[in-house]
Amino acid sequence: MPLSERLSAMREAVRAGAHHHYRHDDTPDIAAEAAARGLTWAQRAALRTVRMCAGEPPIIEPDQRIVFTRTQRRVPPLYTPDDWAAFRATLDGDPSGEINNICADWGAVLDQGLLARRAQALATRARLAADPAAVEFLEAAVATIDSVLDLAARYAAEARRLGRNDLAAALDEAPANRPTSFHAALQALRLLQAVVWLSGHMHVGLGRLDQYLWPYLAADLAAGRLDWPGAEELLAEFFISLNRDSDLYPGVQVGDNGQSVMLGGVDRAGREAVNPLTWAALRVAGAVAMIDPKINLRVTPDTDHELLREASRLTRLGLGFPQYANDDQVIPGLVAFGYDWEDARDYTVAACWEFIIPGRGMEIVNVGAVSFPAAADAAIRAGLAAGDAGFQSILDRCEAEIRAQVHALIEPERRLILPPAPYFSVLMDGPLATGRDLSAGLKYNNFGLHGAGCAAGADALQAIHELVYDQRTLAPGDLLAALDADFEGYESLRTRLRETVTKVGNNDDDADAQLVWLFERFAAACAAEGDNGRGGRIRPGTGTAMFYVWLARGRAGLREPVVGATADGRHVGDLFGANLAPTPGVTVRGPLSTLQTFAKIPYDQIVNGGPVTLELADNVFRGDEALDKVALLVRAFAQVGCQQMQINTVNLATLEDAQRHPEQHRHL
């Protein structure tokens, strides 16, 4: 669908930051007010939501149909540094930063409306009147609900003053009550999600948008209140609106603010759930061509070819999405880990790729990363120096290193205390019924660990296996000296390690065996940790986040080990592959071989997520036949049994020009 003239102008205005003149640095002094009133931690969190909502004036620009423009640049702290230090000393544990990277039950909140959830909170308060903690939480939750309702009411009043009765009607209706139109549902979702950011949280995803919004759109279409062009116009404006404030959201510097959407898949009963809004969301995301929302698509080997073609059109734009998740691997894997079937079928992703359950998970999916290259390197250096007689001894050392890394990352997290989140709790399943803030836990409370640098770690092990122990053509002392020298003076050895040893990514069973072994040992190490201190377990995954850089070059405060030169021929400081990808610079036969390699990972044990990452030149996408080929590649991804995949479109000239003229490439 082409964007209308109205929306094209709106998009360009957002890209240019035309609305930034509304912004200011005057934020409420929550710490001072809370101290003067003697408020608790939970009460302070509620006060922040209340004051931040009150500090947002209604801004309605001409022709806007989806409104909310954030004016306050900063979210204020709840304590002064001195007061926080004193309060922290009273806690029996280690407090974390604000809760983030989870997904609200947006469908339930829209379906019920905030007034119904407010009534539930008050009923629970009456039932638990003798429980001071429950009373405090529920009163805090009600205060946040009231602040959102007031914000919506002020926007409605301004819309009415401007003669925008259509917009006023939508705001009068929702989020207070269940929307009766697609427009009202989108507007309510915009406000509800924006206030999560205002409350100090980040990486606020939108979950299975095509599932929970479809009933509203279907009703409008059936009643003749809306046609498809009008529906796509509204959805496009909603997508554009998500980019108005995204530069204020933490994480945008590395291209990730967590506004992810999951499309397609099955419903909680296992029935096919692709609907007309699934298709429309793909079309609209392509027309809008902005970084938010980040589109994910659930697929199987049987997904409709035309749907995959539509997704491939979106990939062609070079935005890095859609990201694909294979239901045939993800759902059974989650069930094997302990999730109920109904919840597993309802999965979405957190900010990046970690699989979570909307409304039911208080999972911390990114507590750190195991460095496979560091584990392999430590084992190789120690084993060769000690004169280990066989390769199995190297593997035994590597397994011990992996276990040590996992334990070192998880043990401190057992004392973790999550800060109260009264408004976010309103949007989840359970807190208003139990009288307990979501920080106390929900149905699922697992931790997630990334398994980073898997190809480099496996390639290093394979080099030792082939050259030192199998062929016996490389003296251990020579390799150790070369590693210590970062291969300076050992260039021929480095070339041999890089070019003659079999590598991960070519569907070579010998090299891939090291990859599978690493993930099996990683899963075993996570399982051995048992309970995480919050009633959950440790989920191993295949993602890297930014660890593909940090584990190679370090960063301030990094807990994970940084490794130097490695036995796969990698120089000190060279980056690792991102997520599941061959080591940079390795020659691979093609994308299918890469998919076949990573399909060997035991995804029934590795459930935290992390995509196979493929980089395709943009000329691959020229012509409609090319879209068919990319669609077939996505189908092959599902057929061979991979779990998750991201395809990036690369044009070197465009990227170089974007470095020189970023203002001309704001869509990247």
For the regions a protein language model found, what residue spans apply to each?
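A conserved hydrophobic secondary-structure block that centers on an alpha-helix together
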Residues: 162-165
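Conserved catalytic cores of very large enzyme subunits
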Residues: 1-141, 169-177, 181-668
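Low-complexity, highly charged intrinsically disordered N-terminal segments
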Residues: 141-144, 148, 152
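Extended amphipathic alpha-helical scaffold segments
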Residues: 152-159, 210-214
